């Protein structure tokens, strides 16, 4: 695992994010440090599940950025997953925003809830991405950190079965801009905010380097 394996566009994107760490509010930094502490204590076996209501936008962004950021900062063995309180579909606007950031994402199956293959580096394993409940068989059943990235899921799941750690880290839903001239900007902003905070957590997990 090496940052050199990341696609060039992603390396450029990730290199710009630390300049924004100072803009992360201190209460959120404390939450992200709790995540980093969990990751360090797992000694290379950390599993995180990023959760929002529909597993459609923010949770997928969180999953993919956590995976890419772990490689960028040399956090060994981390496995990132996502889920919802219900299954819908990986929203095309979220797919597009992640592609603009530098991920390579390919649709592999047809249907209302297609399976995608996401890649962030030449020699890094592809991640199978589709909308699912957080307790789907594709996700770990216990010992993981549950990261609640929307207030609705946070309220709906005050207790997450099997989670060793539950953190509330809500982001604004870019869905509000669907079908408007601000759509692309809203998704890019959400993507960048989520990337920045997961990068901060991975930098902390790596020892603050």
Predicted regions located by residue number:
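Short polar/charged helix/loop
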Residues: 2-209
